[in-house]
Amino acid sequence: MELKFSCRGNVIALSFNENDTVLDAKEKLGQEIDVSPSLIKLLYKGNLSDDSHLQDVVKNESKIMCLIRQDKDIVNQAISQLKVPDYSTNTYSLKPKKPHTTPKPASIYTFNELVVLDYPHKDRALRYLERLRDDTGIKKIMDSHRWTVPLLSEMDPAEHTRHDSKTLGLNHNQGAHIELRLRTDRYDGFRDYKTVKSTLIHELTHNVHGEHDSSFWELFRQLTKEADAADLLGKPGSYVSDRASYTPQQDNDDEDQKNHRRDLLLAAAERRKQSGSKVQKE
C-alpha cells in the first residue's frame, strides 16, 4: 500500500504492508521527519485511531493530513521561565469596578482546528484563518445551518495550480476538512480577503451539494446574502424607511476579486474533469 502524507508543507510518500496499523504509519513517518509518534496526528475523513488497520480506514495512494502537536514538556518549560510580576508592593488608584458581565458562550458550530503551511509569515496566515473563523457573516452561516467543520487549513498553491487553472478551495467529505488558498501565486503576499471569504462560502455550500448544479448556486447565493446581512448588522449604516442598505465595495483594480467568478468556474470544470476520469478508470 502506497500512502502520501502532507506534513509541514511537504508531501512524503511511504509504503506499508496490508496488516500495518495507523500506529505503524506514525512510527514510520516519525522516523522520516524526526518526530515522536506520540506527537503525530493523522487525519483522513476524520481522526485515525492508532489501532486501526490502514487497509480498513484509507485507500491505496490516499493523501493523509499530518498534524504535529507541540511537546508538552517544552511548553511547560517555557511557561515556567516566564516572569510573573510582583504586585504586592504596588499602589493602585481606586477606580469604580466595571459591571460584571457573563461572556457569551462560544458556539459549537465553528471550525475546530486551524492549520497553516510551514512557509514564511505563518503567523499572518494563522491570523487570516482566525479572521475567517470569527467573521460575523461566516459565524452566522455556521450557526444558522448548524455546521461544524473539524479542520480548516491553508491550501498549498503549488499542489493545485496548472497552466490553465487554479483551485481556490477544496471541501473534503462534505465538511470534514476545508482547504483555502490564502497566498498569492507568487507567494509574495496574501489574497484579497473578500475573495477568500467568498471561496469559503462556496466550499461551505459543498456541505450540502457536491455538484455545481442549480441547487448548488441557489444555496450559494442564499448563504452569501445571509453573510452580507449579518455583516450589515455589525456595521454602522444609513437607514431609509427603517431599512438598512449596504452594498459591498467593489475594487476594480483588484485582480483577484475581478477574476473570482472565472476562477470558481475553472475550478468547477477541473473537478468535473477529475470526476469523469475516475468514472472511466472504474
From Swiss-Prot:
GO terms for biological process: DNA repair; protein sumoylation; proteolysis. Its EC number is 3.4.24.-. Residues 1-75 form the Ubiquitin-like domain. Residues 269-282 have a biased composition (Basic and acidic residues). Disulfide bonds: none annotated. It is an enzyme of class 3 (hydrolase). Its cofactor is Zn(2+). It is found in: Cytoplasm; Nucleus. Residues 99-274 form the WLM domain. Keywords: Cytoplasm, DNA damage, DNA repair, Hydrolase, Metal-binding, Metalloprotease, Nucleus, Protease, Zinc. The active site is at E203. GO terms for molecular function: double-stranded DNA binding; metallopeptidase activity; proteasome binding; single-stranded DNA binding; transition metal ion binding; zinc ion binding. GO terms for cellular component: cytosol; nucleus. Zn(2+) binds at H202, H206, H212. It comes from the Eukaryota. Residues 234-282 are annotated as: Disordered. Belongs to the peptidase M3 family. WSS1-like metalloprotease (WLM) subfamily. Metalloendopeptidase that acts selectively on DNA-binding proteins. DNA is needed to bring the protease and substrates together to enable proteolysis. Involved in the repair of toxic DNA-protein cross-links (DPCs) such as covalently trapped topoisomerase 1 (TOP1) adducts on DNA lesions or DPCs induced by reactive compounds such as formaldehyde. This is DNA-dependent metalloprotease WSS1 homolog 2. It comes from Schizosaccharomyces pombe (strain 972 / ATCC 24843) (Fission yeast). The lineage of its organism: Eukaryota, Fungi, Dikarya, Ascomycota, Taphrinomycotina.
